[in-house]
Amino acid sequence: MRLDALVINLNRFGDLLLSQPLLHDLHKAGRSTTLLCLEKYADTEGLLQFASPLLTVPDHLVSPEQADATRHELQAWAENLRASVQADHIINLTPSMPARLLATALAPTPEAVLGFGLDHKGRPRVDGLWPAFLHAAELRQSNAPFNLADMFRMTGAPLLGGLSGELLSQPGSGLLSELGTEARETARRLLAHAPVIRHGFIGMQLGARE
């Protein structure tokens, strides 16, 4: 499979859903793309547009706590994936060292990594101002000067050319996929068991941070 851009997001589930606007913008700009996430979030493919086939990496290979022990195994896994998936650019939205190693291993050159990568000497590399904002937000949510979804989008903006501003302003851009009939019926069955006094509206926040 040949891609213009592979988006790597090894963050939490809520952050993963916030990749949708970036995927939408890349698609509208004519870029072939998909998403690489943690294996435990494989079912997310049904919620995201322009992320099929969704690629997943075993969770333990990219755990920061096991980075030293799994480094060589992760490198071998990346080389195996690259044999079947070639991307001209990697957009890495995760600043951890395993994510940087993975992004660099999948990219044709270190300079082809947007966001968080490694330089030719293996030192951490941040490509631009927006990833720097994103890194600050990852360290402490209260440091985030902008909406997380927009920081994701602007990290990938170099691949959008002059379209980035236009795409960001489009109404309805970056919406998640609509739920299928089976998922809707499951939700209705769950809500049907609610006590009478609970009937009405239900609010959900997927991926709450603090």
Descriptions of predicted regions:
Residues 1-210:
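Catalytic machinery of carbohydrate-active enzymes
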